[in-house]
C-alpha cells in the first residue's frame, strides 16, 4: 500500500492542515501513515487547523505511537456479507516512527476554541444586524416625525410677518401724529415768540415811562425847591421890610423927638415929600403880587404835572396789568403746550420702545425659529449620515456574514470531500493556490496563504506548498465545482 502525505506551510505565522489516509489496503496488510501538520485559516493571525485520519478497509483504524489531531474511523465502500478471518502481520505490532506532532491535542483544543470564537462572533454579528435594523426603523420613524413637524412649523413665519406689518403701520401712525404735534409745537413756539416780543416791547415802554416819571419827578422836585427858595426869599424880604419899617419908625420917632424941642419954619414943597409908607406898601404889594402869581403858577403847573403823571401812571398801570394778564395767559398756555408736548414725547417714546421691543421679539422669534430649523436640518442631515453609516455597517456585516457562511460551507464541503475521498479512494489531487483582491473562486475550498505563492502537485515538498501523492489504484475524487465571491484576498483551487 502506498501512502500519501500533505503539508501546507504559511509565511504569516498561521498553522496549516494535514490529512493522512490509506486507500485500498492489500490483503493481509494495513498501513497507516501520517505527517505533522499545521492548520490554515481564512483569517490572518488565526492559528490552528484540523486533521483527519481514516482507514479504508474492513477494519477500524487504531493509533500508533503518540496521539494527534482527532481520530475518526470509518469503512469505505460496502462491507462484505460475512466476516472473514483477518491475518495480521506481527511486524506491524512494532512501534512505528510516525513523527506525530505531540502538540496535536493542544491544536485540536485550539481549533475547538477558534470554532467557538467564530460562532460567538457570528452570533454577535447577527445581534448587531438586528440592532442596526431596529436603529434603522427608529431613524425612519424620526425622519417621518421631522418631516411632519417641518410642515407644521412653516406657518410661523407669515404670522410674525403680519404682526410686524401691523406694528409698522402703528409706527407710521405714531410718526404722522408726531409730525402733526411738531407742526403745532412750531406754531405755538412762533406765537410764543410774538407774545414774547410784545412783552419785551411793553417792558421797554414801561421802562421808558418809568424814566419819564423819574424825570418829571425830578422836575417837580426842582420846581418845589424853587418854590421853597422863593418862599424863603419872600420871607427874608418880609423880615427885611419889617426891619426897615421899624428902623424908619425909630428914626422918625427920633426926628420927632428932636423936632419937638425946636420950632423951625421951613417952606417946603409938598410935591417933593417922600411917602415911605406908600412906597413900602407899593413894593410890598408888588412883591405880594409877584409871590402870589408865582405861587399860583407853580401850584397850577404842579397840579397839571401831577394830574398828567397820575393819568400816565394810571394808563401805564392799566397797560402793565393787561400785559401781565397776557403774560400769565401765555405762561399758562406755554405750560399746557409743554405738558402736551412732553406727554406726546413720552407716548412717542413708549410707542417707539414698544415697536423696537416688538421688532426685537419678532427678530428673536425668527432667529429662534431659524436656529431650530437649522438644528432640525442638522439633526436630519446627521440622521441621514447615521443612517448611511448604519447601512454601510449593515452592508459590511452582511458581507462578513456572507464570508462566514461561505467559510462554513467551505469547511463543511472540505470535510465531506475529505471523507468521501477517504471512503472512495484517493487519486491524484492537484491543488492550485493563487492570490487575488476582492473576490475568490474555488472548487470547494478557500484558504488564506501568502501572496505570490502557488501550490502545485509534484513529488517534492517545499516551503509554502502542498505535495499530494496517491497510488494509481485509487480513483481520484472529483469535487463539485463551485464558485463564490467573498472579501478574502487569497484562493485555493482544486481541479
From Swiss-Prot:
Residues 111-422 form the IF rod domain. Residues 419-494 are annotated as: Tail. Residues 1-111 are annotated as: Head. Keywords: Coiled coil, Intermediate filament, Keratin. Residues 112-146 are annotated as: Coil 1A. Residues 258-274 are annotated as: Linker 12. PROSITE patterns: IF_ROD_1, IF_ROD_2. The keyword Lyase does not apply. It comes from the Eukaryota. GO terms for cellular component: keratin filament. Residues 147-156 are annotated as: Linker 1. Residues 157-257 are annotated as: Coil 1B. Residues 275-418 are annotated as: Coil 2. The keyword NAD does not apply. Heterotetramer of two type I and two type II keratins. There are two types of hair/microfibrillar keratin, I (acidic) and II (neutral to basic). Belongs to the intermediate filament family. This is Keratin, type II cuticular 87. It comes from Mus musculus.
